[in-house]
Amino acid sequence: MSNVAVVGSQWGDEGKGKVVDWLAERADVVVRFQGGHNAGHTLVVDGVTYKLSLLPSGAVRGKLSIIGNGVVVDPWALFEEIERVAAQGVVITPEGLRIAENAVLILPLHGNLDRAREAAAGNAKIGTTGRGIGPAYEDKVARRAIRLCDLADEDVLRFKVERLLTHHNALLRGLGEPELDADSLISALLEIAPRILPFASPVWKVLDEARRAGKKILFEGAQGAMLDVDHGTYPYVTSSNTVAPNAATGAGVGPSSVGFTLGITKAYTTRVGAGPFPTELFDDIGRTIGERGREFGTVTGRPRRCGWFDAVLVRQSVLVGGLRGIALTKLDVLDGLDELKICTGYRLDGQVIDHLPASMKAQSRVEPIYETLEGWKDSTFGARSWADLPAKAIKYIRRLEELIEAPVALLSTSPEREDTILVRDPFLD
C-alpha cells in the first residue's frame, strides 16, 4: 500500500478535481499542501457539482481533510466556502477538517496589495487572481506573517500586526494607497478567531499517527508544475512550489511518506493569464478545443488559452517532480479532429533543444517542433476500458507515453468519476 501525491503537470486546470475525487473515495485522509484559494477545482458527486478552492476534495466525501502548513489560508474565504458546501448538504466540522496551526493567514491587506500592484504594473502585470496569495507568501518568507496559532494570544497578535503594518504601510504609501489601521485589523482577526481556532491542529502529528496506523493518505496539489515558483515559467508563476516533492514539506511529513506521485495531464495544453505558451493555437482549432473542453477558469471565469500537447513541458515536469505515472484527461475533446500535433522539441536561435530554458526572454522565443498524428472519428467520451477506445486514440496515448517518459496510470474520458480507465492503481504500487 502506498500513499499518493497528485499534482498538475502543465499550467494547472488539468482536471485534478475529478481524479482527486476518484482517488479520495479510496483514501482515508486527504491533504492540501500548497497554494491558497486562487486555484479552484470542480467535483461532481452523485450528480451534485461542488466548486472548491481551499477545502481538500475529501471534505465532500466525509474523509479526514487536512490543510497543511504549506497552504496560505484566507479565513473569510474559507468560511464562505464552508457555508457554500453546507447549503449543498455537506457539513464541515473541526473533527473532519484540520488546519495546520502554523499555516500562514491571508489578510485583507494582502488582496489589496496584490490588486494595487497589478494595476500599477499595467501591461507588465503577471495576471494574478488578486486574492493576496503572493503577498502572503512574501510575508511568510520574510518572517513577519500572521499564523493561525497567533490568533490564540491577543498580545502576540497585536505585536505581530503592528510589526507587519510597519512594512505594509510603507508599501502602500509608495503605491499611493491609504495606510492601514492596526486596531481595525486586530479587531477583524479577533472576531474570526473563535470560529477558526477549533480547526487548528499540529497536522504533522495527525499525519504521522495516520501513517503509523496504515491509513491511506492522498496529498492534493493545486495549480501545475509549470506554475512552480522555481521550476515554472518565472515570473509568470504562482508563489509556491507546486511540484510533487513539496507535498512532504507542505504537509509536515518525511519524503518517504509520499509514495506514488501522479501527474494530472490534459491531452492538449491550456493556460490562463499571461506568460509563454509555445504550442498556443490562435485558429479555429484552438477555439474548437476551448469550446469543447469548456475552458474557463473555476475561480476567475477567465477563458483559457488552448494549444497542442507539449511533450517537452510535460517530460520536464515528469523529471523535476519525479512523477511515476500520469492521469490523462479530456481525451474526448480531441474526438473528430482530422489530425493532431504533438510538440517534441523546440527551436531556439537555429538550435534544436529538448527542454524549456529558464530565461524569460528565451521562453518567449522558442518555436515548437511538431510531430503529426492522424486523428480518430469515433467517440472516446465515457469509455471505461481500452477496448472502447479507437485504435488511433490508443496510438496517440502510447506516443505521449514514449515522449514524456512516463506511463498512463489513469485515463479520464468524461467529467463523471465513473468514466475512468484504471491502468495502474497508485495506492497499490
From Swiss-Prot:
Binding site for IMP: 13-16, 38-41, 129, 143, 223, 238, 302
Swiss-Prot/TrEMBL cofactor(s): Mg(2+)
Cofactor details (free text): Binds 1 Mg(2+) ion per subunit.
Positions that bind substrate: 298-304
One GO cellular component term noted in the UniProt record for this chain: cytoplasm
EC number: 6.3.4.4
Binding residue positions for GTP: 12-18, 40-42, 304, 330-332, 412-414
Active site, per annotation: 13, 41
GO BP term, pick one: 'de novo' AMP biosynthetic process
Keywords assigned by UniProt, alphabetized: Cytoplasm, GTP-binding, Ligase, Magnesium, Metal-binding, Nucleotide-binding, Purine biosynthesis
CDD domains: AdSS
Domain of life: Bacteria
Pathway the protein contributes to: Purine metabolism; AMP biosynthesis via de novo pathway; AMP from IMP: step 1/2
MF terms (GO), sorted A to Z: adenylosuccinate synthase activity; GTP binding; magnesium ion binding
UniProt-annotated location(s): Cytoplasm
PANTHER family xrefs: ADENYLOSUCCINATE SYNTHETASE
NCBIfam families registered for this protein in UniProt: PRK01117.1, purA
Role, per record: Plays an important role in the de novo pathway of purine nucleotide biosynthesis. Catalyzes the first committed step in the biosynthesis of AMP from IMP.
Family: Belongs to the adenylosuccinate synthetase family.
Subunit structure: Homodimer.
Entry protein name: Adenylosuccinate synthetase
Gene: purA
